[in-house]
Each structure stands twice: as C-alpha cells, then as structure tokens.
Amino acid sequence: MLRMTPLASAIVALLLGIEAYAAEETFDTHFMIGGMKDQQVANIRLDDNQPLPGQYDIDIYVNKQWRGKYEIIVKDNPQETCLSREVIKRLGINSDNFASGKQCLTFEQLVQGGSYTWDIGVFRLDFSVPQAWVEELESGYVPPENWERGINAFYTSYYLSQYYSDYKASGNNKSTYVRFNSGLNLLGWQLHSDASFSKTNNNPGVWKSNTLYLERGFAQLLGTLRVGDMYTSSDIFDSVRFRGVRLFRDMQMLPNSKQNFTPRVQGIAQSNALVTIEQNGFVVYQKEVPPGPFAITDLQLAGGGADLDVSVKEADGSVTTYLVPYAAVPNMLQPGVSKYDLAAGRSHIEGASKQSDFVQAGYQYGFNNLLTLYGGSMVANNYYAFTLGAGWNTRIGAISVDATKSHSKQDNGDVFDGQSYQIAYNKFVSQTSTRFGLAAWRYSSRDYRTFNDHVWANNKDNYRRDENDVYDIADYYQNDFGRKNSFSANMSQSLPEGWGSVSLSTLWRDYWGRSGSSKDYQLSYSNNLRRISYTLAASQAYDENHHEEKRFNIFISIPFDWGDDVSTPRRQIYMSNSTTFDDQGFASNNTGLSGTVGSRDQFNYGVNLSHQHQGNETTAGANLTWNAPVATVNGSYSQSSTYRQAGASVSGGIVAWSGGVNLANRLSETFAVMNAPGIKDAYVNGQKYRTTNRNGVVIYDGMTPYRENHLMLDVSQSDSEAELRGNRKIAAPYRGAVVLVNFDTDQRKPWFIKALRADGQSLTFGYEVNDIHGHNIGVVGQGSQLFIRTNEVPPSVNVAIDKQQGLSCTITFGKEIDESRNYICQ
C-alpha cells in the first residue's frame, strides 16, 4: 500500500531544493513511500504536484465535505487515473451529462470545469465541482452507503460502586451498585443487554435485567429492528416495557436538523454526594459527585420519555429528591419526511404478575413547512387507545395539540372510558436569545387510562415494595395513577453581553380523588465577573399536603493558574464556595478546591470543608479520580464529629475481538478499536490519559453514529521505534457498531549509521541504500548519515557513488550495528 512517511516527506522537500539534478533522477519508492515492494519508478519529477503510481486508501472530499474512503489506483500517467460511475454516484456527483459509453471518468472529466487537489501526506483527495452537479449534504452528515457495520466483537461497559457511612446515632449503612451494559456484535447484528445489581445493608441483593434485545439497522428503511426485552417509544403514548419486536425510524440516521432532544439532569451537591437517577423503577444512573453544581448529560435511557426520579444523598445521610420531567414536543418534520414506530409483544412491567399482549403503531408526517400530522393506536386485550394530533410551525413558535381516547376493561369487570388532551409549545426567539422549551399542559378525564394504568389496575393487589429502590415501580399506582392536570415548562434567557443568563423551570400536577397538588419552581442566574463565575439559584416546592420548602443557593468559582507550559505544565486549580439558605435562614456552606494533575492530566482531585447549621456540624472531605488507560477509579471520604462516609467506584470497558482482549477506561454504545501496531503510548484526540497499549491498540468511545468521526493519534509522547504512516482516520459507524480503525505503521528497526567513502568524501545525499538482494532499505541523509529500516541486521549494504557510471560501494556489518562508529563504504 502506497504511504508517505513524515521522514520521506522531509527528504522529498530537501530533494526539491536540488531541482536541477533531482528532477530527472530515478528513485525507489519502497523506503521513501513505504509500499510497492521490488518496483522501481523511473523519471519521476518530484516537483510535480502528483502522487506516485500505486494503490491508495484515500479519503475523498467533494466541495470540502467528506464522502467516504475509497481505494484508488493511480496510473503511471496520473492524468489517466479515473473513477467508475458507481463510485462517482456514491460521491454524490451527477454524471448524467457524461458520455454514456464511458464507464471510468478521469478527474478532469468528473470535476466538470472545477478542480482537484491531492494531499498525499494525509491521504486526502479534494474535488471542487460546480454546485449544480453535486448532491448537497448537511455538514457532518454521511450518506448511508458509507456507514460501517463494524467487526465481530463482545464488549461490556461496567460500573461498580460501594458506598459506606457510619453514624454514631444510628449505626452504619452500606450500599452496593453494579451495572453492566454489554453487547455481542456478530455479522452486522447486535445483542444488547442492560443489567444491574443493587444491595443495601443486610437486604439480599437483587439482579435486574432492564433490557435484552437483538438489533440491526437498515439503511434502506432509515430504521432499526429490535427483538427482545425493551421499551416502546414515548413520542405519542407513554413508554411501556415489553418483550416482543419493534421497528422504528432512527432519526439519527437523518441530518442533525431532525434530531430529538435529550434530558439534562442538574443540581447542586453540598458535600461528596451520591446521585441516583431512576426511570420506570430501574436505577439508570448512579455516580458520586463532589460538592458544587453538577450536570449529567450522558444518560443512556432505554425507557423513552418516562420521568426521571433523582435523589442526592449527602455525606451526612440527608437525601434530597426531585423529579425531572422527560417529555418532548413531537418533532416538526421537514416536508415529505415521515417517522414511523411499530411494536408488538407482551408487557413486561417490573413487579406486575399479570401482563397483557398488545400492538402499538405511531406515525408522523411533515406535509409542508407549517404542518406536521401524527397519530397512533395501542390495542390490547380489553384495552385500546387512539391518538390524533397536529404540530404547527408558526411565527410565535412550534405548537402541537393532540387528543387521546382510551377504553379499559379491568379483570373485575369495571369499564373506564376517558380522554386526554395535550398542548405543547417550543420557541427560540433569536432577537432576544430567549428559549421556551417543552412547555406542555395535559388534562386527563377521571376515567382516562394509559396502558400502564390498565396493567397496574389489574395488579394493584399484588405489587410489593422493593427496598433497594428509592422510588419503586410499585409506587406508580399509589402516586401517579389518576393524573388530572400536568403542566411543565422551562425557559432560558441569554442577557446582553456581560450580563449572563437566567433560566426558569416549573412543574405542577394534581390528581383525581386527591386533594391538593404538587408544585416545583426553580430559578437560576449565571454570569462571569472576569474569570470568576457565579450562580444564584432559588427553588420552591409544595407537596399535596401543602408542605412548603424553599431554598436559595449562591455558588462562586475562582480559577488560579501556575506553570508556563514550557518548563512546567500549565495547571489550574479552582476554589469554589456554595452557600445555601432555607426557610429558617442559613442552612449550609461548603468551600472546596479542585484541579487536575499528572503527566497526562489523569488525576482529578478535590478537597472540601462544609458546615451545616442544623446540629452545628462541620465536615471535611476529599475525593480523587484516576483516569487510567484501562479504567476510571474514584474514591471519596468525609468525616465529621458524628459520622464517617466513604465511597469508591471503578468503571470501564472490556472488549474482545479477533485481535485480542482490550480494556478501556470507559465505553459507550458505539466505539472504535484503533490499531497502530508497534506504537505504544500514543494518545487519542487530545485525551492524554487514553493511550495505545504495548500492542498499539486503544479503545475510543464517544463515536457518533451515522456521522463523520475524526480519529487522530498523537505520538509526541511515544518512544516507540515504529513509525506511524498517517495519523488521521475517519469513520462513520452504524449505531452500536464496533469499528476497527487500522493505522499503517513501519515496525522495522531504525538505524542511523555514519559512513564515508574510502577516499574520505561524504556519500551523496539522497542516494538509495540497498540490501544484498537489491531491495531499497534506506537513504543517505545530510552529513553522510545513512538512515535504514530492517527487520534484522543486514550483512552489508550497497550505496551508489556515481549512478551515471554505475559505481557503488559496500558497507559491511558484523552481528550488530554500532551507531557510534564511523563506517567506511568500500
């Protein structure tokens, strides 16, 4: 495979400076370019802006948009190099106006008056084609024909945590949580599993399987097929956990402008706290966080739009709980774009002994720039529901209105017929930078039943509490059944430059058959004063018993720098302070220091000192996170006069593939196995703690499905003798794919040899160095220094002295090469 190495590039640049002689010289390409073994290329003009003949793996760009990686064979006359009509079609270039008899078109022909340029150093070919002849793509979007299925592999992403607290007044408390997100990818199919284990104190631990399904994406349908245990969509009906089959349009296969929103969970921890997020009765996220504001944006939710129950357990044992609504305004689709979702199976609701078979279908269609219609049906034994709705894209924002009719007949013969109506609103006012997001109001009549209501009504005498859960799924029937009105909204406003931003969110609910209502309001203001950032936050909550809770928080963060990034690395340490007030006045204060250290920024640390007004208690704490190449390890400790608290966790990933078993410090749903044989300690995409192992392999997660993912290796901190030939690659995987990205390397041992001719003169710069078989293994550099690469020490090498007269000399070695010695070429 033809490859230009960094050293060869430098040598070529030097050779071009001797244009009068070198332009007509003959050079072997094996060493300088790294391919084409045993081939000689004659009369190559090195000053021409053309690649040498051979086969290349090239990233092709059309009008600066990546269109995929292709094998191109450059002919002896580069002007005759051509591409087939099939490749041209995949590039998105219209070839209808070309002569029908031509099946392979030269570059000059296909650019149709435009231009093309090579950049062999990074294996890139750019075509500039008149826009009228190009199928335009949204920035970052990749056509389906360039999506990669990936390789066969087994993987698991794990998280293990242990939390311990010891209170003088009440004794100790222990909790264990383990979660595995695993997958088996085989022949383009993917088996996904999400399982967890929870244990508190002396209660027996409980294993739960949240999801287990087989999946495959289909580019022709722009959709995904799943079979197994999973959740239905929440776009039209409430999400239902079930066992069966589901076929749906994967909106991420479409350009970015048609993507869905994802929830964001945020709050403020007063100490080293344990944040637990539950959905549908399953713990979907648990993490220890240091004192101060936290924001969780990497949730992997299987349950669609079910609300999130969040609990923050502080070091002193106090627990704050709140609800994060998870509902979205139905997508306003582009004209002619549709979204479908079909599901059939049997409900698999946790804790319910009586389940029900059902079929669900949903469909959305964008008629024009103003109107999107949608509808759906849910049919089961003794239950049905139908929904019709419309979304309008108006000048005052996106508005959707829908109505649902339900019929439920319970096992005891009771019949309930009801209706539910919803109005949702979403708007961004660009002139004022105001965003109204997910403002939604829903009213349900007394006898309206969701499918979850229907199933739980038939199980209301059988459910039991799971002591391992903060909010058990059984609490659904007691707390959420019979919802009457529900209103949620959030607004954010960017103020004029220098004035910061403000956000407001609210949630209000009431229920049939219950007096009172629950209300929750949150208001925050954030800004920066030079380098100092601060946030003012206020919240007010009312429960159904008219109990009111108010909180006000002031958070300040100040960065301090040291190091000049030359003699010492530049570092930052942050000093923060968080003060909270409640109905009684001052409640707590926390002061902390945090930062990052390590040669590869692999350690994050924090220390804090907090004081609680209640009990007049002062607590000291510390936390440390180690981002190792093979795992992420975290530990925390807090102590006061009345309690001690400690927590530890380890997370990471294990990947088994044909090249072996590799460890990663984290693993997401879609990831890459980057393979650079012989290159050790090279880091990926600027993440210095994520490095290649001794075999040159590193796992890189965070790949975006169906999009360009740029992968780069940095060898500046690597002392490997192997040479990396091109450090950048691009991949566009299917969702859930494990993509193998191979980097070309030269693992032959490098030698630097000092040598002179027998008459004491220097050898000619730029001449080849050949082994005893006549194969090129190196070149003469400046100062009569030879650079060669070999798998083993050669008995001797030959160097040309005068090519026109065919004169050469030989350097003889012993069993080893002494790089400190001056050799004589005789």
Swiss-Prot record:
This is Outer membrane usher protein YehB. Keywords: Cell outer membrane, Disulfide bond, Fimbrium biogenesis, Membrane, Signal, Transmembrane, Transmembrane beta strand, Transport. GO terms for cellular component: cell outer membrane. GO terms for biological process: DNA damage response; pilus assembly. Disulfide bonds join C809-C825. Residues 1-22 form the signal peptide. Its main location: membrane. Disruption phenotype: Deletion of the operon under classical laboratory conditions does not result in any major effect on E.coli capacity to form biofilms compared with the wild-type strain. The operon is cryptic under classical laboratory conditions, but is functional when constitutively expressed. It comes from the Bacteria. It is a multi-pass membrane protein. It holds the Pfam family PapC_N. Part of the yehABCD fimbrial operon. Could contribute to adhesion to various surfaces in specific environmental niches. Probably involved in the export and assembly of fimbrial subunits across the outer membrane. One of its GO terms (molecular function) is fimbrial usher porin activity. Induction: Expression is negatively regulated by H-NS and subjected to cAMP receptor protein (CRP)-mediated catabolite repression. It is found in: Cell outer membrane. NCBIfam families: PRK15217.1.
